[in-house]
């Protein structure tokens, strides 16, 4: 007798409007999510040239409240949170005792709300459960964690014209919202959390709000001409911007220094965080590997897990790779020894049993409106 096990996937509050827009769905981190709508290439270029709209409701959403919250978070993250003002945000990594990355996340600091310190954490969907458990075990009892992951929708509007499309629909002045800042506004008569953040390399906002208001926002933006986009375009966009994907560039065996995230590690300003000794040791003794960008000839696509070699010796591994719609070339991210991480270094990637040349190039591969 054959036993069939059916795995039930979670659905986003925007599933129905995505279906109506022609979405092709896929399973990702326990959710059924749009892979693409009209096509990856069209969606990717819409974000680079104008504006695109993503349903990212699968992301984990934690509200943290309690006395001493800032100090408690500072103990679990390598970043200095002491200078964050209410309305500011910090990208960081959640570390284990060995300095490995449990997740990458964004801390949205809200300051004192009703007399108590408060922050929002947006974490990866695949690690939502493990992050919640880790935080619950490592934060003081005085800190309350409210998991709103399945209660609120989250959409991202990204692209050089994203702000212009969103502005008429919100009650705040988005021109006054700097990069990596956030505010509470009103959308469709409902409170909405709007952050000037994203995962594409372009300018834009991520908006967290009740499901009904999210559906209204989605319909208004698409009616105005914003292109709905799926996970496929989100991945190629973040790869061009050389942004890490957990499970590819980041995992528990990888420290943030190796991953090129030294800019979120504030050893001089955060003297006591979990995994700090290991990071100091790695910095003192030298890293064993470094994340690099690779460019390959033709349409040779290096996928996750493909070996990287020099001569006949395997020296590294590809973490992500794709055709770049913006640059019209094959690009990849890979880990290699520091001695082989210099720009211009010639390497080989094994693709379907064939050795294909690859050159170490500067990251990010493309600098969008986020960097301008």
Swiss-Prot record:
This is Aminomethyltransferase. Coiled coil: none annotated. It is an enzyme of class 2 (transferase). Pfam families: GCV_T, GCV_T_C. The glycine cleavage system catalyzes the degradation of glycine. It catalyses: N(6)-[(R)-S(8)-aminomethyldihydrolipoyl]-L-lysyl-[protein] + (6S)-5,6,7,8-tetrahydrofolate = N(6)-[(R)-dihydrolipoyl]-L-lysyl-[protein] + (6R)-5,10-methylene-5,6,7,8-tetrahydrofolate + NH4(+). Gene3D superfamilies: Aminomethyltransferase beta-barrel domains, Aminomethyltransferase fragment, Probable tRNA modification gtpase trme, domain 1. The keyword Transferase applies. It comes from the Bacteria. The lineage of its organism: Bacteria, Bacillati, Cyanobacteriota, Cyanophyceae, Synechococcales. Transmembrane segments: none annotated. One of its GO terms (biological process) is glycine decarboxylation via glycine cleavage system. GO terms for molecular function: aminomethyltransferase activity; transaminase activity. The glycine cleavage system is composed of four proteins: P, T, L and H. Keywords: Aminotransferase, Transferase. It comes from Synechococcus elongatus (strain ATCC 33912 / PCC 7942 / FACHB-805) (Anacystis nidulans R2). InterPro entries: GCS_T, GCS_T_bac, GCST_C, GCV_T_N, GcvT/YgfZ/DmdA, GcvT/YgfZ_C, TrmE/GcvT_dom1. GO terms for cellular component: cytosol; glycine cleavage complex. Its EC number is 2.1.2.10. Belongs to the GcvT family.
